[in-house]
């Protein structure tokens, strides 16, 4: 999934009606986006209904969940779901897998997540391919002879693994087509992730997995309102991933206050604890020109794909329109001028 021109995607939260997914995905395709993803965050809708709705309304854009996790959805079910999306989209599905966030509060055991992801990938791959030899994993296994009771359209689909950690990144370097840093707009993370996946020049056998940078996006000509909205939207994610970025020093006071503010008062109050400098490392926020500059900086750092995440703008439709009509052309014009 690398080696060609940079690719661009939009990521949607799973909190809409089917008609909204159809309309927004159709608009994204119209503006030339390459990928439309649906998040798999805890307590939201599962990605599958949204992806099936998007498949009905589009014909070229790639579609997939970013991401499913094998701890709340067994790999056998994951295989069936991605096969359904691939069939509905006529071969445009990809599969995104990650360890998942917020699962500890449910008492879910995520011990040795990298190994669990490896085993989940093996189960999904065997089922899609029709390999009946079985998978003998510690966490996930498939008995010999097991197979899907329906025929997938393709024997494999592109694989994306989402992670902030070096162990799972190393796994992704050997398994995945893409690795996504979800919740980051920080150029400094790109070469670090490249090294973790084994893709830097210093590696004995460099691999080239595509690096995807995706984050909350709020683009609008009303810069003040856009950044205020972005602070609210990014606060729940910053509370999770803020500690994972070793290239950013977040003040202790911010980390200490953010979580309690979220739990006690919600994102509006927590937004007070997201300063400008931190916001720009974890979100795309501001005018179309500013967001385009952020995207170019990530591509210059070596990112292969940018995923502009929900809510996109002060309104869903307005955000997609500005991203497609102003941000994407500005980014492409800058790259072509070099």
Language-model regions, residue ranges each:
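Active-site-adjacent structural elements that line small-molecule/cofactor binding pockets in enzymes
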Residues: 1-338
């Amino acid at each position: 999934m690398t080696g060609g021109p940079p690719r661009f995607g939009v990521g949607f939260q799973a909190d809409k009606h089917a008609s909204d997914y159809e309309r927004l995905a159709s608009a994204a395709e119209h503006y030339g986006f390459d990928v439309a993803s649906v998040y798999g965050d805890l307590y939201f809708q599962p990605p599958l209904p949204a992806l099936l709705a998007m498949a009905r309304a589009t014909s070229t854009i790639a579609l997939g969940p970013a991401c499913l996790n094998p701890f709340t959805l067994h790999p056998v079910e994951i295989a069936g779901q991605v096969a359904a999306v691939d069939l509905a989209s006529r071969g445009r599905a990809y599969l995104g897998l990650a360890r998942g966030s917020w699962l500890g509060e449910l008492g879910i055991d995520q011990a040795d997540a990298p190994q669990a992801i490896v085993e989940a990938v093996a189960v999904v791959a065997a089922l899609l391919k029709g390999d009946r030899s079985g998978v003998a994993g510690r966490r996930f296994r498939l008995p010999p002879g097991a197979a899907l009771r329906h025929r997938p359209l393709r024997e494999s689909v592109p694989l994306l693994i989402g992670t902030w950690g070096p162990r799972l990144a190393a796994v992704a370097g050997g398994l995945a087509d893409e690795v996504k840093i979800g919740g980051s707009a920080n150029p400094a993370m790109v070469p670090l992730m490249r090294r973790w996946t084994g893709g830097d020049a210093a590696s004995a056998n460099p691999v080239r997995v595509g690096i995807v940078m995706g984050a909350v996006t709020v683009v609008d000509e009303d810069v003040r309102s856009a950044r205020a909205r972005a602070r609210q939207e990014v606060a729940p994610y910053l509370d999770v991933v803020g500690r994972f970025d070793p290239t950013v020093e977040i003040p202790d006071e911010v980390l200490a206050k953010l979580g309690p503010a979220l739990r006690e008062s919600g994102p509006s109050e927590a937004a007070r604890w997201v300063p400008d400098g931190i916001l720009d490392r974890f979100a795309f926020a501001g005018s179309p020109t500013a967001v385009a500059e952020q995207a170019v900086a990530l591509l210059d750092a070596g990112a292969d794909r940018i995923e502009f995440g929900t809510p996109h703008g002060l309104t869903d439709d307005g955000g997609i329109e500005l991203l497609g009509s102003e941000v994407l052309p500005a980014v492409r014009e800058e790259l072509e001028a070099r």
